[in-house]
Curated annotation (Swiss-Prot):
The lineage of its organism: Eukaryota, Metazoa, Chordata, Craniata, Vertebrata. Residues 247-259, 265-275 have a biased composition (Low complexity). This is Peroxisomal membrane protein PEX14. Residues 1-12 have a biased composition (Polar residues). Residues 88-99 have a biased composition (Pro residues). It comes from Mus musculus.
Amino acid sequence: MASSEQAEQPNQPSSPPGSENVVPREPLIATAVKFLQNSRVRQSPLATRRAFLKKKGLTDEEIDLAFQQSGTAADEPSPLGPATPVVPVQPPHLTPQPYSPRGSRWRDYGALAIIMAGIAFGFHQLYKRYLLPLILGGREDRKQLERMAASLSELSGTVAQTVTQVQTTLASVQELLRQQQQKVQELAHELATAKATTSTNWILESQNINELKSEINSLKGLLLNRRQFPPSPSAPKIPSWQIPVKSSSPSSPAAVNHHSSSDISPVSNESTSSSPGKDSHSPEGSTATYHLLGPQEEGEGVLDVKGQVRMEVQGEEEKREDKEDEDDEDDDVSHVDEEDVLGVQREDRRGGDGQINEQVEKLRRPEGASNETERD
């Protein structure tokens, strides 16, 4: 018990020497009282108890108070022999014995059963893996061979089917490739032909355009030449009173009308306007020439008159064309309508034929007058 009490006292602070006048500490005194009241401590001598308490840091006053409160100051053990210092006895150390429950036997039995079961399972596996194949090896081999043969036959059938399917798919793919190649070749041929046709069409169009440009340029040149250069001078005109006319031929007016309407081009009115005055001034000279000229000379005179009339008509046509060209300067030459031009030419020709008829009628009048003078 002294050792236990000593273990309880290590936390108590030790008082420094020379601190006797310090106020007694109640908790230390209380612990000292408990220590002194212990039965084993009470059997020890008083000096040893005091020395132990001083070692724990208690002063003499605190020790006296502890003895008074514990009531052990008068206790004095009976001396049995020589005084020997009392040493606190420690209890002997006992070794712990293993705990043996009552069901240990059942555990032993269970472990034995588990071991036996493992051994039996091992023997069973050895028998199943090694002994049975030796005993029943022929049967198993036959069954395995039969199974392998069946699986091989199934595999061969499936392989044959897959091969046929692959062959059919390859044939279809080859056919599709051939068709695609044909289509590609056709498209390439069509493209080549289209390129060739487009190139030829482009060349032809360019040629046509060039021709049209050249024609337009030529027309422009002609128009400019007509405007720049003066018209060609006409042949000298013969007055109508000098033209020989046969008096005895009654069919001459009809012949003249026939030639004027069919062979003679449009004529002008210049020769006709000058011929009547001259005929009126010299009717006798005209009659004299009629009697002097022969039939051949009369025919030549008529032809000369026709040529003069044609020249005059051509001059008037050129003047009219110049006027029309001046009116059409702002119009594009390429957009001229051919039908309008033909209509204008026809109208000009009709007007020229009417002028020729008028000239012929005017030429007939002196012939009739001369015939009347001859008859008189």
